[in-house]
A protein has these predicted regions:
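N-terminal beta-strand motif that seeds the catalytic metal site of vicinal oxygen chelate
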Residues: 15-50, 63, 94-101, 198-207, ...
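Core segments of cupin and vicinal oxygen chelate
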Residues: 44-84, 89, 234-235
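Catalytic cores of nucleotide-enabled group-transfer and carboxylate-activating enzymes in metabolic
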Residues: 33-36, 46, 52, 71-74, ...
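Short, small-residue-biased leader/transition segments that mark boundaries at the very start
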Residues: 1-3
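Short, structured motif recognition centered on aromatic/hydrophobic residues
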Residues: 10-12, 39, 56, 62, ...
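Active-site/pore-lining binding-face segments in mid-to-C-terminal subdomains
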Residues: 91, 97-175
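Short beta->alpha transition motifs characteristic of CBS
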Residues: 12-18, 152-157
Length: 236
């Protein structure tokens, strides 16, 4: 089923067909962190973030993680233990901004960063950096379709039952993530925000992942999934 959020078409899917064959990467990697946290996250361009929050929060039941207004309007949503699986960016445009895949090993991210620079002169969209809200260390790559792919590691796991939505004002990154595709004046806004954050001594915690919390979220998800399947069988 497809619906629209005042511009972007959203497809709702239940129990998609999955391939039993294991994924084989084009280069040696340690694998991706998916499982109960899903693929990673997706971010959409929108003209007005505030107008669309009720659609995702109240109709689709996404939970707000955090939001910010400077240097650009952003709102992040979670649907499981991953800090955010979806986000809106108030760029005034429509369409796909980027999706993120999370690697199990930081070296996979670093090696991919090197390979992309060696093989594609202008392949990097955002330089290597670390985000302030989900603590993801990542870089963004250009695609032929015009959107970006974020290649990340070390994303934050939260407890959805205890999480409180809040505004963030540190800017999107602790360091790095220089937006090479933007004009100099636009890049300067983000650079100033990073410098302010550094001067305040803001940084991510030393421990960014908790195996115990991850396993408990996984267990809760599996119980909920079984219950949903039983409820569906009762309806049918």
């Amino acid at each position: 089923m497809c619906i629209r959020d005042r511009g972007n078409r959203i497809e709702l899917v239940y129990k998609p067909h999955t391939d039993n064959s294991p994924f084989v990467s084009g280069r040696p990697i340690s694998g991706f962190k998916t499982d109960v946290c899903g693929l990673g996250h997706a971010v959409l361009h929108v003209s007005n973030v505030d107008m669309l929050i009720p659609f995702y929060r109240d109709i689709l039941d996404f939970k707000i993680s955090d939001y910010s207004f400077d240097p650009i309007s952003l709102c992040f949503f979670h649907v499981n233990g991953r800090h955010h699986s979806f986000a809106l960016i108030g760029s005034g445009q429509q369409g796909f901004h980027h999706f993120m895949v999370e690697y199990k090993n930081l070296d996979d991210v670093g090696q991919g960063y090197d390979l992309l620079q060696y093989n594609h002169k202008n392949g990097i969209a955002y330089t290597l950096g670390r985000h302030t809200n989900d603590y993801m260390t990542s870089f963004y790559a250009h695609t032929p379709s015009g959107f970006f792919i974020e290649n990340g590691w070390g994303g934050r796991i939260i407890d959805p039952t205890k999480w409180v939505p809040h505004e963030t004002n540190e800017g999107p990154s602790f360091w790095g993530h220089e937006r090479l595709y933007l004009p100099d004046d636009e890049r300067l806004k983000f650079r100033k925000k990073r410098i302010e954050t550094a001067q305040k001594g803001k940084r991510s915690p030393m421990i960014i992942d908790c195996p115990w919390l991850y396993q408990n979220i996984k267990k809760k998800y599996e119980i909920e999934k079984i219950q949903e399947e039983e409820d569906l069988e009762d309806i049918l």
